[in-house]
Regions:
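Conserved functional hotspots at enzyme active or ligand-binding sites that engage polyanionic ligands
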Residues: 1-100
Length: 100
């Protein structure tokens, strides 16, 4: 399962870690997708909520994927479930206009 952490960026906000867990110990930076309560209904969003460890219904915003310093990651607060992985894949494909 992909972890959801609090990241200390412009302010503390939840993020979904996209970098593979296998390489995390060897990296100084990690790629994350921010999680926001602003739901636009876009194909680049993945719905998450309390079951994922997020306090409110929110979305993973794949239009705003960024790479941050690993030290900016705070505590793990939840996970994206395996059943949500196909939705994440589709959202990333849409965000980067990739063919399936």
């Amino acid at each position: 399962m992909r972890p959801i952490h609090v990241a200390h960026l412009d302010k503390a906000r939840p993020v979904l870690v996209l970098t593979r867990e296998l390489v995390l110990p060897h990296q100084q930076q990690v790629t994350v997708a921010p999680i926001t309560t602003t739901v636009r209904g876009l194909s680049t969003e993945v719905l998450v909520g309390p079951a994922n460890g997020i306090g409110h219904e929110s979305v993973v915003s794949c239009d705003n994927i960024v790479t941050i310093d690993k030290n900016a990651l705070g505590e793990r607060i939840g996970y994206l479930f395996p059943a949500q992985e196909p939705l994440l894949t589709a959202a990333i494909h849409a965000a980067f206009d990739l063919d399936n």
